[in-house]
From Swiss-Prot:
Segments in the Cytoplasmic topological domain: 64-74, 136-154, 226-277, 335-386
Protein name as catalogued: Oxytocin receptor
Superkingdom in the source lineage: Eukaryota
Glycosylation-annotated residues: N8, N15, N26
Residue stretches in coiled coil: none
Phosphoserine sites (modified residues): S368, S370
Protein's job: Receptor for oxytocin. The activity of this receptor is mediated by G proteins which activate a phosphatidylinositol-calcium second messenger system.
Name of the gene encoding the protein in the UniProt record: OXTR
Organism expressing this protein natively: Sus scrofa
Length: 386
């Protein structure tokens, strides 16, 4: 049957492959082979992505757990986005890595369906939690006086997770363990030909990529407009203050009012603009990482002559997983104090452990501790451990 994608990249979360060959001639010809050199490159890339995604997002969750600002609205969404990235690492990247090593799926039919289901759950969750965080930043800028409503935030996150679980359900029906050659079984997708693969991949592309990108663009368009309004108000207020200073006491009250408006605009900008920059960079990383993936997916189902076995075509499929290991570095860039506090707490607790485990070397340990924290001797993390 048409649409069988070689080199085992059909094991990706959204597989555009059709049912295995059913013609007797295909059965007797033996199972399809793969490019072993390319497979080794895939394994190396996936190992690196898995390590970075697991270690980076685990550090983010640990830092968020130990920070003093646990109830921050932004940190709440960062936590769930990191959990979604861990789901991608464990249930999408890791199975794909094992699959590239073994070439064939070795497991029962239930495991085949479960793996394919969880792969798409992570994809949906990572996308829509990022969308939810961006909507929250948009509301924070456009409605700065909006009260913090933690139950509403939790309900929105819960609804997002449940929606992702439901939206991924078709994977359970599409994928199954099937015989691809005489005595050779693999986890394959079965579509109604010829429109099945086109309909499903197009729907996934719309739901996970195109619609979220449109909404994200609208969010940051509104944010940019609001920031421009604030800057214009700030400029007008500064001009009014300058005029008031030259017109004497009669205009003094107007000058003070203008100064108050200037301070208000400054406060909004300083409090929000950094988090907006962070989420904007995360969105850019999402677009850069996922665009090649969905481009080759759509190309493979809408063009019968697409080079499905080309190296560049296959490597482009792997770039999507990079998004899960990029996010922790973006968090570190914009919220570096989180990781600074985490490192301080770790070093402080390690030093405290050394002092208690070596009572005969108290003076040496105390000297080491003072030199280690000479740059941050007043930090709260040090006080909590001492």
């Amino acid at each position: 049957m048409e649409g069988v994608l070689a080199a085992n990249w059909s094991a990706e979360a959204v597989n555009s492959s059709a049912a295995p060959p059913e013609a007797e001639g295909n059965r007797t010809a033996g199972p399809p082979q793969r490019n072993e050199a390319l497979a080794r490159v895939e394994v190396a890339v996936l190992c690196l992505i898995l390590f970075l995604a697991l270690s980076g997002n685990a550090c983010v969750l640990l830092a968020l757990r130990t920070t003093r600002h646990k109830h921050s609205r932004l940190f709440f969404f960062m936590k769930h986005l990191s959990i979604a990235d861990l789901v991608v690492a464990v249930f999408q990247v890791l199975p794909q890595l094992l699959w590239d090593i073994t070439f064939r799926f070795y497991g029962p039919d239930l495991l085949c369906r479960l793996v394919k289901y969880l792969q798409v759950v992570g994809m949906f969750a990572s996308t829509y939690l990022l969308l939810l965080m961006s909507l929250d930043r948009c509301l924070a800028i456009c409605q700065p006086l909006r009260a913090l409503r933690r139950p509403a935030d939790r309900l929105a996150v819960l609804a997002t997770w449940l929606g992702c679980l439901v939206a991924s359900a078709p994977q359970v029906h599409i994928f199954s363990l099937r015989e691809v050659a005489d005595g050779v079984f693999d986890c394959w997708a079965v579509f109604i030909q010829p429109w099945g693969p086109k309909a499903y991949i197009t729907w996934i592309t719309l739901a996970v990529y195109i619609v979220p990108v449109i909404v994200l663009a609208a969010c940051y368009g509104l944010i940019s407009f609001k920031i421009w309004q604030n800057l214009r108000l700030k400029t007008a207020a500064e001009a009014a203050e300058a005029i008031a200073g030259t017109e004497g006491a009669a205009a003094g009250s107007r000058g003070r009012a203008a100064l108050a408006r200037v301070s208000s605009v400054k406060l909004i900008s300083k409090a929000k603009i950094r988090t907006v920059k962070m989420t904007f960079i995360i969105v850019l990383a999402f677009i850069v990482c996922w665009t090649p993936f969905f481009f080759v997916q759509m190309w493979s189902v809408w063009d019968a002559d697409a080079p499905k076995e080309a190296s560049a075509f296959i490597i482009a499929m792997l770039l999507a997983s990079l998004n899960s290991c990029c996010n922790p570095w973006i968090y570190m860039l914009f919220t570096g104090h989180l990781f600074h506090e985490l490192v301080q707490r770790f070093l402080c607790c390690s030093s405290s452990h050394l002092k208690t485990s070596r009572p005969g070397e108290t003076s040496v340990s105390k000297k080491s501790n003072s030199s280690t924290f000479v740059l941050s001797q007043h930090s709260s993390s040090q006080k909590s451990c001492s």
